[in-house]
Amino acid sequence: MTWAAVIGSPIEHSLSPVIHRAAWAQLGIDGWEYRRLEQDGASLPGFIGGLGDDCVGLSVTMPCKQAVMPLLDAIDPLASAVGAVNTVVPSSGVLAGFNTDVAGIASAVRRACSLAQRPLPASALILGARATASSALAALGELGITTSTVAARRFGGPGSAVAAASRLGVTIEQVLWSNVEAVLQAARAVDLIVSTLPAGVADPLAQCLDVRDGQVLLDVVYSPRNTA
């Protein structure tokens, strides 16, 4: 049977099967199976090495977005610059990695501004500093924002937004998450706030923040539907 899957850990919460099955139905694709597969850094090499011709694609979530990269035959230049892969496409025996988070974030911001009939943001704060934050940095660069503030518990490391910034040619200003007043000050000053944090982590900040008119907020968490 032809199949695709979302891989990561934990994976039981993922709505990727619902999204993809709905898309397939719209496209008239029938007879394909979409799976949730629990995979982590330890199990990933064996899983990737065992993929057959019946697999048509993988959606990749944490903690596999960076771990999968050395296991692939080819990586799209944007995904290499970001330092994270969220989509794997097998073709003629070649496994290629891509990053669609960048386009998704940029498109969401453009759509929000278009619906509100407002100009694109000129400044931004990113909450978090790992793989999705790196994608957000690249998306902001596409929107013309080349200097962003990043608030996180820690910075650094090969998979961090700090490392991605140098590859992407953008600049970041670092604010420690523990410095609540500094984070709030940064949040009040920018046009756009992008949270790449797990569900609930940004709630204390959201409860202290008075969103000003025209400010755009993007939370990558999609479950629950409404976040703080």
Segments from the language model and where they lie:
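NAD(P)-binding Rossmann-fold cofactor-contacting core
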Residues: I145-G169
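Glycine-rich Rossmann-fold phosphate-binding loop(s) that bind the pyrophosphate
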Residues: S9, G128-R130
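Short beta-strand elements in bilobed, periplasmic/extracellular small-molecule ligand-binding domains
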Residues: I29-L37, T147-T149, V170-Q174
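Rossmann-like adenosine-cofactor binding region
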Residues: T171-A228
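N-terminal Rossmann-fold NAD(P) dinucleotide-binding loop
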Residues: A133-S134
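Phosphate/diphosphate ligand-binding glycine-rich loop within oxidoreductases
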Residues: T2-L115, P224
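Short, conserved loop/helix-junction motifs that constitute active-site signature segments
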Residues: R118-L120, E142-G144, Q207-Q215
